[in-house]
Every structure is written in structure tokens, then in C-alpha cells.
């Protein structure tokens, strides 16, 4: 399908283009302030029209995978692609007086083959013009691109866009949309971390995962002095189409996105992921299997946090498992969930390249009723930090059938801390290691006779201090094995309590062990719930080996 022909044909209101008076007035009044890069025909645009467009598109066959790019772009190396820079003199709102925000576009090339169309919208008249690709919008530097192959190819489109905010206009971006339906944002550290997506399809099924694309964006012209703007997007894939509205607030210490989507199923969908996010966890306090580097921890996120519909708060530390793991946490109208990076201490990472201590958390706050479903978490084995291996999303309980229409409203918070947190005691850290011996005797001259795994969970905040004289009770539930040597320790350096126990196997099974714990005082819960998944070693590995060489 020719997307340019479709988008123009789907907008019945495009008849306004025939009015030369309106067109002349609009081009002079609205687009002159935007560096004149919007050069397409004038068409009327609004969100209702975009929804109609997406609904009509769902009744047509999918247009298929992206077509080929000119060889000079298709064969770019990552280094060459990164050297292509958008010319800031041609930024979308370059001519807006007292602008606090600006937009630049990404070049197509390398793995970014989908030709994404961009439109500028005047918010007063609701008229839009397309921004066509041309080489003069970019600086190719030493990328080695043969620009003669690009001349006259206005249908190349763009790969995505990024947003800049004063006082760092044209220097450091705060929002990025690039590739399929992926997008990211930063907090006040300007350090990117995990990503979000518009939609996830069949992430964990017996079929192949499907990655929908944002194929077009419409930008409402930002007002002078404003740090909020609105962008609309058309989503398209083999199984579904969608109309999206993003109201993006670029605040001083965080980026907040109000997202509204309307989805139209082309065919039955086995697994639909709403508000999906993708992150990386290689190693941390609780999992050091592949941490043979100079860095104590390597991760974009350290936990999945959930505020369930019944009010329960959940902390689920992330893992880097040896086998792919998928867990679905059932819920009804969740209040919120997210992948968080709460450990912000540089000394815990010692990384001057990745700066993992500066990476943002991402919290999802549903704004309408989502009904029954599950917060789904997939963890994939990884040996390093260059591949994302954590996926999280909301999966509706109801099966999605061809012709179904769905709508989800939610808010995304990109910030150091989530906007809400449990008033009860919270999990600060999870640690695991050798068990079966008294603390302070690790392991001494004699290794323990019986193999065990030790877990230490640190809690802070809430009413822990007030509860301590009355008695704090750890309530531990295990899917297999036994918890022994349970200890409650006050730890002055972080002014909290450490709950420590040893897990002993009761069978030879290597199936994951689901662990659950919360703190109780006089029958009342005084902490959020800690969830964990532990992977026991094979029976022949459940022994301690003294590998000392005595001379």
C-alpha cells in the first residue's frame, strides 16, 4: 500500500486544499514561523479524523514490511549512521519566538528502514502540511553517504524524531521516537535508559513476535514559552492499527506523557501488550551470575513495581535467568506498575560510560478502567549490557478478535522516582549468596555440611520503628523448599531492617522457586510484598568446593 496515497485519500476533509485563500493565509501565518520546512499540501487534521483513518486502514490488507532503501543508506555501519546529524537550522520550531521546545528528525538508514511521514499542524486552524525529506535538512559529515542517490526522493520520509528543551536546544534531547513503535525519555540527568513501545504483540507465544510501526506523526505547533506539546501517531502492523495521542510535558526534573490510544484489530491476536516497556538487567545485588566485570551492578532497571487494584504494593526484583522466564501477575483495574531504577548510588555501579545510576524509572498510571488482565514480565538470558532482556506490559484477559476496537488511556512518568509509593515499609535491596552458616563465619575453615541459599531483603520506611517493640513477623511463602534460620536485624547505616533466611531444597527439582514475603505486626501488614523467583542449581551442583591450594 502507498501510505502517502492512503493518508491523503482517507482524509475526506482535504477538500479544503482547494481554497487558495485559506491555503495562502495558512502558509503565511502558521508555517512561516516553523523554518518553512513543512512543504506539503495543506489538509485538515484532528484526532477524530486520525481515528477514522486507523479504523479504515484496519479493513485493508497490511502494506507489508518496509521497502528497500538506496544502497548508500541500507549499508551504513552504526558509526556512519550516528555521524549523520540533523541541521538544527532547519528544526521544526526554529522560527518560533521564545520557544522552549524544538523537534529534529532522524535519517532513515541502516536498520531503520520504515519511511515515517511527518506533518506540522496549526492548532488554531487544524490544518496540516507534510514535511518531506530532502538532503539539505541533514549534515552528513563523514558518514560516506552518496547524496546524489537521495536527490528527488522526497518519499524517503524519516526514521523518527527527537525533542529538545531549553536551555539545551539543539544540544541534548529529552524525548526520542525511533524504530518500530519505540520511544524513550529522560529525567533531569539527560541519561537515556529503558524504552517504551506503542504496542506489543505476541511477545511470548508459540508464534513470532510482531513489532507494529508508527508510520506517521502529526505535531501540534508548540506555543511560545510552553514546555508541553502534543503529537499524534498512526500505528500499523499485520494484526492491528491504532490512533495515538501523546501530550508530552517536558518538566524540569521529569517527562510526563499522557497517552490515549484507539486500537482496531485486523485479525485475532493471541497476546496484546498495552503500555509495554523494554529494559536491561545483566547483574545486580541479587544476581551476579554474569557479573565478571569491574562493575558491581549493570542494569537499566532493578525491579518491577506494582500497585494492584486491591491496593497491595508489590516489589519484584529483576533477574537475568539461565532460561527465558515469563510470569503473569493477575490483576483487576491496576492502579499502576513500572520498571524502576531506584539505586542511584554511583559507587554501586562504578560505570563512567553507561552511568546506570542516572537512568530513569518508568511508571505507568492507567487513566481509564482496564478491567481484568495481568502485568506480564518476560526475562531473557543475556551475557552483557548491549541487549535488552526485560519486557513488561499489561495483557488484557479478554481475547482479541478481528474487528475488535479497544481504547486505553494512561500516563507515563519518566523520572528518578515513581510519582507514588507505598506508605508501608518498602524494599530497598535484595541480596543472595551462600547459606547454611552463621553470619560472621563465612564459611570459616569448614564449609557447611548441607547446601543452602541465603536471602537478605532490606526494608526501609513506613512504621517499622514503631512496630519493632511490638514484634515484626516475616510472612514467607515458598512454592517449594523450606525457609530456615530466619533473622530480623536492625541495620543502622540505612536505618531499616534486614530480613534474612536460608532456603533449603526438599527435592531435586530445578524448577523456579516462587518466593513471597511481607512483614506483619499484630496481624496487620506493615510492608509492601516482596516477590522473587529463584532458580536452584542441579542436585550435583548443590555442594561447596574448597578450591584452595595449600603449600
From Swiss-Prot:
Tell me the superkingdom of the source: Bacteria
Q: Where in the cell is it found?
A: Periplasm
* GO function term, MF aspect, one: catalytic activity
Specify whether Cytoplasm is a keyword of the entry: no
Q: Which InterPro entries match?
A: Gal_mutarotase_sf_dom, GH-type_carb-bd, Glucan_biosyn_MdoD, Glucan_biosyn_MdoG/MdoD, Glucan_biosyn_MdoG_C, Ig-like_fold, Ig_E-set, TAT_signal
Q: Which UniProt keywords apply?
A: Periplasm, Signal
Q: What is its main location?
A: periplasm
GO terms classed as biological process: beta-glucan biosynthetic process
Keyword Endoplasmic reticulum applies: no
According to the UniProt entry, where is the signal peptide?
1-32
Q: How is it modified after translation?
A: Predicted to be exported by the Tat system. The position of the signal peptide cleavage has not been experimentally proven.
Q: Identify the pathway.
A: Glycan metabolism; osmoregulated periplasmic glucan (OPG) biosynthesis
PROSITE patterns tied to this protein? TAT
**PANTHER family hit by this protein:** GLUCANS BIOSYNTHESIS PROTEIN, GLUCANS BIOSYNTHESIS PROTEIN D
Give the function comment from the record: Probably involved in the control of the structural glucose backbone of osmoregulated periplasmic glucans (OPGs).
**Family per UniProt?**
Belongs to the OpgD/OpgG family.
What is this protein's name?
Glucans biosynthesis protein D
Lineage runs: Bacteria, Pseudomonadati, Pseudomonadota, Gammaproteobacteria, Enterobacterales
Q: Which gene encodes it?
A: mdoD
Amino acid at each position: 500500500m502507498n501510505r502517502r496515497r492512503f493518508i491523503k485519500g482517507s482524509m475526506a476533509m482535504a477538500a479544503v486544499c482547494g481554497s487558495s485563500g485559506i491555503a495562502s493565509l495558512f502558509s503565511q501565518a502558521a508555517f512561516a514561523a516553523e523554518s518553512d520546512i513543512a512543504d506539503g499540501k495543506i489538509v485538515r487534521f484532528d484526532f477524530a479524523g486520525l481515528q477514522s483513518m486507523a479504523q479504515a486502514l484496519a479493513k485493508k490488507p497490511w502494506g507489508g514490511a518496509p521497502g528497500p532503501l538506496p544502497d548508500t543508506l541500507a549499508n551504513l555501519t552504526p558509526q556512519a549512521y550516528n555521524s549523520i546529524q540533523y541541521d538544527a537550522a532547519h528544526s521544526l520550531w526554529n522560527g518560533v519566538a521564545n520557544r522552549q521546545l524544538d523537534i529534529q528528525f532522524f535519517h532513515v538508514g541502516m536498520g531503520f528502514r520504515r519511511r515515517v511521514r511527518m506533518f506540522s499542524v496549526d492548532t488554531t486552524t487544524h490544518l496540516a502540511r507534510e514535511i518531506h525529506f530532502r538532503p539539505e535538512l541533514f549534515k552528513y559529515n563523514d558518514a560516506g553517504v552518496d547524496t546524489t542517490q537521495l536527490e528527488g526522493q522526497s518519499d524517503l520520509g524519516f526514521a523518527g524524531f527527537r525533542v529538545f528543551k531549553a536551555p539545551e536546544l539543539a544540544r541534548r534531547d529529552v524525548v526520542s521516537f525511533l524504530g518500530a513503535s519505540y520511544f524513550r525519555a529522560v529525567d533531569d540527568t539527560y541519561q537515556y535508559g529503558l524504552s517504551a513501545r506503542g504496542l506489543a504483540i505476541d511477545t511470548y507465544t508459540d508464534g513470532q513476535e510482531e513489532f507494529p510501526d508508527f508510520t506517521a506523526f502529526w505535531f501540534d505547533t508548540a506555543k511560545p514559552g510552553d514546555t508541553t506539546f502534543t503529537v499524534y501517531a498512526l500505528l500499523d502492523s499485520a494484526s492491528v492499527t491504532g490512533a495515538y495521542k501523546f501530550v508530552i510535558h517536558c518538566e524540569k526534573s521529569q517527562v510526563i506523557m499522557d497517552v490515549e490510544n484507539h486500537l482496531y484489530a485486523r485479525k485475532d491476536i493471541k497476546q496484546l501488550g498495552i503500555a509495554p516497556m523494554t529494559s536491561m538487567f545483566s547483574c545486580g545485588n541479587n544476581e551476579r551470575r554474569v557479573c565478571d566485570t569491574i562493575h558491581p551492578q549493570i542494569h537499566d532497571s532493578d525491579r518491577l513495581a506494582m500497585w494492584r487494584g486491591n491496593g497491595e504494593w508489590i516489589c519484584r526484583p529483576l533477574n537475568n535467568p539461565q532460561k527465558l522466564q515469563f510470569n503473569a501477575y493477575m490483576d483487576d483495574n491496576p492502579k499502576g506498575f513500572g520498571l524502576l531504577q531506584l539505586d542511584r548510588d554511583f559507587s554501586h555501579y562504578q560505570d563512567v560510560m553507561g552511568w546506570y545510576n542516572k537512568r530513569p524509572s518508568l511508571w505507568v498510571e492507567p487513566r481509564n478502567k482496564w478491567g481484568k488482565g495481568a502485568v506480564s514480565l518476560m526475562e531473557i538470558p543475556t551475557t552483557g549490557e548491549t541487549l535488552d532482556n526485560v519486557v513488561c506490559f499489561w495483557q488484557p484477559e479478554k481475547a482479541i478478535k478481528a474487528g475488535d476496537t479497544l481504547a486505553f488511556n494512561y500516563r507515563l512518568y519518566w523520572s528518578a522516582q515513581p510519582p507514588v509509593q507505598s506508605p508501608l515499609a518498602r524494599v530497598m535491596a535484595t541480596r543472595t549468596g551462600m547459606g547454611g552458616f552463621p553470619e560472621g563465619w563465612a564459611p570459616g575453615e569448614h564449609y557447611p555440611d548441607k547446601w543452602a541459599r541465603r536471602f537478605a531483603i532490606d526494608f526501609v520506611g513506613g512504621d517499622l520503628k514503631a512496630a519493632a517493640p511490638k514484634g515484626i513477623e516475616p510472612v514467607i511463602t515458598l512454592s517449594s523448599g523450606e525457609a530456615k534460620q530466619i533473622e530480623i536485624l536492625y541495620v543502622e547505616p540505612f536505618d531499616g531492617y534486614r530480613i534474612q533466611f536460608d532456603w533449603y531444597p526438599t527435592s531435586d527439582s530445578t524448577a523456579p522457586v516462587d518466593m513471597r514475603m511481607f512483614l506483619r505486626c499484630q496481624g496487620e501488614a506493615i510492608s509492601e510484598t516482596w516477590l522473587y523467583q529463584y532458580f536452584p542449581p542441579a542436585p550435583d551442583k548443590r555442594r561447596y568446593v574448597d578450591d584452595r591450594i595449600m603449600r
